[in-house]
Amino acid sequence: MSFTLMDMGSENFEFNANVWHWKTTLEVIKSFDIVSEGKLRQMSYNATGVKVEKEEAHEIGTRIRDEILPKLGPDKRIFADLSITDKPDDGTFYKDDDEQWKNYSASYEWLKDFSDFCLRSKGFQVF
């Protein structure tokens, strides 16, 4: 499953996310307490068109840049439970219930790109 984030100020400015990165990113956003639980729930489904306003997007981008990226560094990843690892993603698909959480992570580079998108956007919609 994939998600397309479309800037509300320009139809040609968008950001693409797969479910593996997006689920983790939503947990990061949730930890900031910027958007409501209802909006977060809608953001977890593609094609909803839920809107993240400019101020929310900019705060998300700023907090990822200032709070999350310094903890990660270029060679680390963050999991959906917000734990951090320096192990590279080797593409293993974890099927065991106790290990499925390992399937969801976001790298420093991916979060940096998402943060940049948020900061440059006029708000965005999730499709």
Predicted regions and their residues:
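Acidic (Asp/Glu-rich) sequence patches and key acidic residues
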Residues: 1-127
